[in-house]
UniProtKB/Swiss-Prot annotation:
InterPro entries xref list: Bub1/Mad3, Kinase-like_dom_sf, Mad3/Bub1_I, Prot_kinase_dom, Protein_kinase_ATP_BS, Ser/Thr_kinase_AS
The protein, known as: Mitotic checkpoint serine/threonine-protein kinase BUB1
Gene from which this protein is expressed: Bub1
Effect of gene knockout: Early embryonic lethality.
Binding-site residues for ATP, renumbered to this chain: 767-775, 795
Protein kinase domain: residues covered: 761-1058
Length: 1058
């Protein structure tokens, strides 16, 4: 067998180098040689015939070749279902003019008992004038004679007793008209051709005539009666209709087959769904394991750093956080040397169920809270605060369920929260998180805040050392605490008598902080946006409140905010060690708390002189809370938990306006100082993304995890994309230029005005229509500013597609500002129930495909080499930038490169300015997958499938490499690229005979089409530099002239379209 395989490989090599015009003759010689030398090896002969069938199946010049038909008949002998094989040949047009195919096919059907179908096959061959005609007609006459011979014995037995099957036939004959009898159903009902009924009628008439002739030859059979029962010969399998004493009808038989087929389809569907679920579970487990390993590493690093820094903790001041606010009624200024607040999540509540949080996100919170807020030896920064009230808006919390009391029947709260940090240069640890509160300093420095049990397991010993708190005589109590709270706090008061100032001091409730005002993205995008979409609130360090017992002076609240609201402004700075199980645990852990209860003297408030270095080297964040009303009567005891949460809230309804106050001078100066710090923004971004939660549904990975290769079948699967969008740390709906509408998408028509919030849009005309969307040119203007008018595009899709908008926003966030113009810019997204409208930048001068077609009408027929090199250099740079953001475009082709007005206006050295990459609907964000993920699916655009897809190999970034190569090929030759595999090397099918710079282009296409694997991608910068060098050497004097000529062609093309 090995010898035969070697011989076959030699034969294949011979056929690849064969240049004759009759390859079938070579196959015929080889098969004859195999039959002579290996007559007993039938399996190999069958394999050889199968290869021959595949080789010549689509070569129409051999479809009626007698040699090829002979091999098809031989191959049919080895086929278990010959009828299906002959049907396949007939549908492919093979042997339609050969009598041997029809004779073999009809003979097989006759052997199976399907006489009616066999007769139809004979008649089909005669109708198609199959050669040789005489042989086919002779075989058909013999078939009819055999059919008559079968009928004659049955005629002599008509007077004998009938069996059950014959009774059934007799009933059918007497109760059915001749028209109904002609519609008898054969065995293979599903595959019967439409001409069978007519052929059946012809057959019966022929049989009737032959019976009359036999009666003249002294046959005793009556000519008037005998032919009729013979014409009713049953043409179906009686065994399937008769089962013992019962009989099936045709409908019941069909129903039985239908049920069997449905069961099979259901089984296949369930098996497919099971495999998808299995793959998804493995995918999630891989992500979870990967992130857990990374978090373990970070926790170990934190522990090592904490142990190293522990001896010097007494000489180190800390950075503390606060959510400061101002009451909208009083509007008084708050000042303090340190703004600190460490909030906790409610561990147990007597009146409502606590919201369970997964363990993994808590670990991420622990890492962030430890890494992002280290201590610093810097002076304190006072932050005076002022604010103004907000109007009718609501803060929706999407991560935890908390209670928000209302201040009136028509009052709603708005929480616009960022992060605030202030620096404390005192040796003692103050507590000013609750407003203008005086407290006694303590010499015990706060230990690192820990939020997970696993982290506590590592650094528990750090909190067990005894402390020596200072003694204070101030023992004011909080007047708003109820009896349960007083009893709880009394434990600390008792400790204060003997060991120092551990009592609860006088605490004032915080009013709402000043709000932040941002007037949209007009500066960034150049498009006026609806200003009724407030930013999503992000509250750092808030904790939920337990249900309070009703009091006579307590404000009523509705059930609407029982579970999904956020309490803003109320802070209680209790930091505990291990996670408490009961109130008693707080008592034992009170002296180990990192921030005990103090008052802080008002005379220690100082303004640092050097404001520029306030946060010079710190990983700090500034947070600003804005709430409309925050007057809450604390009527019942609160249970504290050590878990610190980050709550994000957003307002999806675009119909509610929001206003806000401005920063005070000190706060703005602090923010500017923060911008000047040397923070590694990439590190902070990764850590903030990790802090968003590592749910099972979320598949976002850390940037520096070296995970093994993971295979995903189809990155464009709708369910997978919905899963990725739902697991984002920053949802698409939280962007300030995203608007959700609770109505259906309106029908977009040209020459019509539409109102989108404060944006008035006039649809001018349809620019293009693809398989997934329609693109309109529109003129928009702000309702509040009649002079503002600008052209844009409206991309209308059904159903809603927020994925493209997400990719566009991620590109703008991850790319450098100087390259933003190279990619499509979306001004806003409007999401409806059944569709979406993306408002984006307009490019007026057509796509690269239009440019290629324009040159086809010139004498050159193709684009000049200088322009090809210019555009190719820009394309390689674009793709390089996209890949550096860990994004795959996925649909690079000539009609997705577009020219805008910048191409006509720019006259600098960058001659390709104005070329932009559009259509991000097929893009893939690799940051949402484990590092090293590969894909196996195929894109829908068959002409742009990369070699990895054609050879069923895994791929990721290769799809963009192939897209660039195919686009450049289209510019060079004016046609789409087709590739072929020659000896394992992929090449374009076109000839490169008179192409300038042949060596360079052959090397380029070889590199782009023959990528070793997903982990060894070629350098786009290397290819770009080679082209740039060639362009400067050969075409530096011609390129501007060619570019100006193209500008004229584009301008004329634009005018012709109008």
């Amino acid at each position: 067998m090995d010898n035969l395989e070697n011989v076959f490989r030699m034969f294949e090599a011979h056929m690849q180098s064969y240049t004759g015009n009759d390859p079938l003759g070579e196959w015929e010689s080889f098969i004859k040689w195999v039959e002579e030398n290996f007559p007993d090896n039938k399996e190999y002969l069958m394999t050889l015939l199968e290869h021959l069938m595949k080789e010549f199946l689509h070569k129409k010049n051999y479809h009626n070749d007698s040699r090829f038909i002979n091999y098809c008949l031989k191959f049919a002998e080895y086929n278990s279902d010959r009828h299906q094989f002959f049907e396949f040949l007939y549908n492919q047009g093979i042997g339609t003019k050969s009598s041997y195919i029809y004779m073999s096919w009809a003979g097989h059907l006759e052997a199976q008992g399907e006489l009616q179908h066999a007769s139809a096959i004979f008649q089909t061959g005669i109708h198609n004038e199959a050669e040789p005609k005489e042989l086919l007609q002779q075989q058909y006459r013999l078939f009819q004679a055999r059919l008559t011979g079968i009928h004659l014995p049955a005629q002599a037995t008509t007077s004998e007793p009938l069996h059950s099957a014959q009774i059934l036939n007799q009933v059918m004959m007497t109760n059915s008209s001749p028209e109904k009898n002609s519609a008898c159903v054969p065995k293979s009902q599903g595959s019967e051709c439409s001409g069978v009924a007519s052929s059946t009628c012809d057959e019966k008439s022929n049989m009737e005539q032959r019976v009359i002739m036999i009666s003249k030859s002294e046959c005793s059979v009556s000519s008037s009666v005998a032919p009729k029962p013979e014409a009713q010969q049953v043409m179906y399998c009686k065994e399937k209709l008769i089962r013992g004493d019962s009989e099936f009808s045709f409908e019941e038989l069909r129903a039985q087959k239908y049920n069997q087929r449905k069961k099979h389809e259901q089984w296949v569907s369930e098996d497919r769904n099971y495999m998808k679920r299995k793959e998804a579970n493995a995918f999630e487990e891989q992500l979870l394991k990967q992130k857990m390993d990374e978090l373990h590493k970070k926790l170990h690093q934190v522990v090592e750093l904490s142990h190293k820094d522990l001896p010097a903790s007494e000489n180190r001041p800390d950075v503390s956080l606060v959510c400061v606010g101002q009451n909208t009624c009083s509007q008084q200024e708050l000042r303090g040397p340190s703004l600190s607040s460490i909030s906790h999540q409610t561990s147990e509540s007597s009146g409502e169920k606590p919201q369970e949080e997964p363990s993994v996100p808590l670990m991420v919170n622990a890492v962030n809270s430890t890494l992002l807020f280290p201590a610093a030896n810097l002076p304190a920064l006072p932050v005076p605060v002022s604010g103004q009230s907000l109007t009718d808006s609501r803060c929706v919390n999407q991560s935890v369920h908390e209670f928000m009391p209302q201040c009136g029947p028509e009052t709603k709260e708005v929480c616009e929260t960022n992060k605030v940090a202030s620096i404390n240069d005192f040796h003692t640890t103050p507590n000013t998180s609750l407003g203008m509160v005086q407290g006694t300093p303590c010499k015990v420095q706060p230990s690192p805040t820990v939020h997970t049990k696993e982290a506590l397991g590592f650094i528990m010993d750090m909190f067990q050392a005894p402390t020596l708190p200072d003694i204070s005589d101030d023992k004011d109590e909080w007047p708003s605490l109820d009896q349960n709270e007083d009893a709880f706090e009394a434990q600390f008061q008792k400790n204060a008598v003997s060991s120092g100032d551990w009592g609860v001091k006088k605490i004032m409730t915080l009013s709402s902080a000043f709000p932040i005002f941002e007037d949209g993205n007009k500066e960034n995008y150049g498009l006026p946006q609806p200003k009724n979409k407030p930013l999503g609130a992000r509250t750092f360090g808030e904790r939920s409140l337990s249900k309070y017992s009703s009091r006579s002076n307590e404000m009523p609240h509705t059930d609407e905010f029982m579970d999904d609201s956020t309490v803003c402004g109320i802070r209680c700075n209790k930091t505990l060690a291990p996670s408490p199980k009961s109130i008693g645990d707080f008592t034992s852990a009170a002296q180990l708390s990192s921030t005990p209860f103090h008052k802080f003297p008002a005379d220690l408030v100082q303004i640092p002189e050097d404001k520029e270095n306030v946060v010079a080297t710190q990983y700090t964040h500034m947070a600003l809370d804005s709430c409309k009303e925050n007057i809450v009567d604390l009527s019942k005891g609160r249970k504290l938990g050590p878990i610190q949460e980050k709550i994000s809230a957003s307002l999806p309804c675009p119909s509610q306006p929001a206003t806000g106050g401005l920063f005070t001078q000190e706060a703005v100066f602090g923010l500017e100082a923060f911008k000047c710090t040397g923070i590694d923004h990439a590190t902070v971004e990764d850590l903030s993304d990790a802090n968003a939660g590592l749910q099972v549904e979320c598949v976002q990975t850390l940037g520096n995890v070296n995970a093994p290769s993971f295979t995903v079948e189809n990155p464009w699967d709708d369910e997978l994309i919905l899963k990725l969008l739902s697991g984002l740390s920053k949802p698409v709906t939280s962007y300030s230029n995203t608007f959700e509408w609770q109505s259906k998408l309106p029908a977009i028509k040209t020459k019509t005005e539409y109102q989108l919030g404060s944006l008035l849009v006039y649809v001018n005309h349809l620019l293009g229509e693809g398989a997934f969307a329609q693109v309109f040119e529109a003129i928009h203007g702000d309702v509040r500013n009649a002079k503002s008018e600008q052209k844009c595009i409206l991309k209308v899709q059904r159903p809603a597609n927020s994925w493209e908008f997400y990719i566009g926003m991620q590109l703008m966030e991850r790319l450098k500002p100087e390259v933003h113009h190279m990619f499509i810019k979306f001004y806003s997204a409007h999401l409806f129930k059944n569709g979406s409208i993306l408002v984006g930048e307009l490019y007026s001068y057509g796509t690269l495909l239009n440019v290629i077609n324009l040159y086809k009408n010139t004498s050159e027929k193709v684009m000049p080499q200088a322009l090809v090199l210019t555009f190719a250099i820009r394309m390689l740079y674009m793709v390089e930038q996209v890949h550096s953001c860990e994004i795959i475009h996925g649909d690079i082709k000539p009609d997705n490169f577009i020219l805008g007005h910048r191409f006509l206006e720019q006259a600098d050295e960058d001659l390709a300015t104005g070329l932009a990459l559009i259509d991000l609907g097929q893009s893939i964000d690799m940051k949402l997958f484990p590092k090293g993920t590969v894909f196996t699916g195929k894109c829908e655009t068959s002409g742009f499938q990369c070699p990895e897809m054609l050879s069923n190999k895994p791929w990721n970034y290769q799809i963009d490499y192939f897209g660039v190569a195919a686009t450049i090929y289209c510019m060079l030759f004016g046609s789409y690229m087709k590739v072929k595999n020659e000896g394992g090397v992929w090449k374009p099918e076109g000839l490169f005979r008179r192409l300038p710079h042949l060596d360079m282009w052959e090397e380029f296409f070889h590199i782009m089409l023959n990528i070793p694997d997903c982990h060894n991608l070629p350098s786009l910068d290397f290819l770009r530099q080679n082209m740039k060098k060639l362009l400067e050497q050969q075409y530096s004097n011609k390129i501007k002239t060619l570019r100006n000529r193209l500008i004229v062609m584009l301008s004329e093309y634009k005018r012709s379209r109008k």
